[in-house]
Regions:
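P-loop NTPase motor domains
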Residues: 1-176
Length: 176
């Protein structure tokens, strides 16, 4: 039984964690992989050709990268939504960010943008995509935890068995 992991997202008394932004700090280049995979997930869920576009991708990419720059102050999907909507939290993250491209984006591009590109217009457009996960009482405790309950790499390397219950009955189609 030690080689079998059973993950049932609908089991709410003690939810397992799955931080979709978690990466191995020994390999900082994984941050780009995480961002690209998240964009791929959102594309599959929302058909980003019609619901996204270059502005969505630019703000989303820089929000996730900013969150990933300082995992100690939070690096979950909840924190991505928060970094977009909460200026004080965004400033905290920026004060700890060592990526000059990300800092430049938030200080020079997003911070100074007006009209349709302003944060006031862009933020609800992006955070609305996160609401599927964050407003769901089953999913929020799973994706809002900092440390995942299991590591996919470890499962594969140690030849463990991962069983995931993705029944749509309680989770809904998008969350499954």
């Amino acid at each position: 039984y030690e080689d079998v992991i059973y993950f049932d997202p609908s089991y709410t008394p003690r939810p397992m964690a799955l931080n979709m932004l978690e990466y191995d700090a020994r390999y900082p280049e994984q941050k780009t992989f995480v961002v690209n995979e998240m964009l791929s997930i959102f594309n599959k869920l929302f058909d980003m050709k019609t619901a996204g576009g270059p502005m969505f991708e630019q703000y989303f990419r820089n929000a996730v990268l900013l969150v990933l720059e300082d995992p100690e102050s939070g690096s979950t999907l909840v924190d991505v939504s928060r970094v977009l909507a909460d200026k004080a939290f965004r400033e905290l993250k920026l004060s700890r960010c060592t990526n000059p491209i990300v800092v430049q984006f938030w200080r020079e591009i997003a911070g100074k943008a007006g009209g349709e590109a302003s944060l006031a217009n862009i933020v609800p457009y992006i955070t609305s995509k996160f609401d599927v996960f964050l407003s769901n009482d089953i999913m929020r405790p799973i994706v809002g935890q900092q440390k995942s309950s299991f590591q996919f790499r470890e499962v594969m390397d140690n030849k463990k068995i991962l069983l995931v219950n993705l029944s749509k009955g309680r989770l809904g189609d998008i969350n499954a």
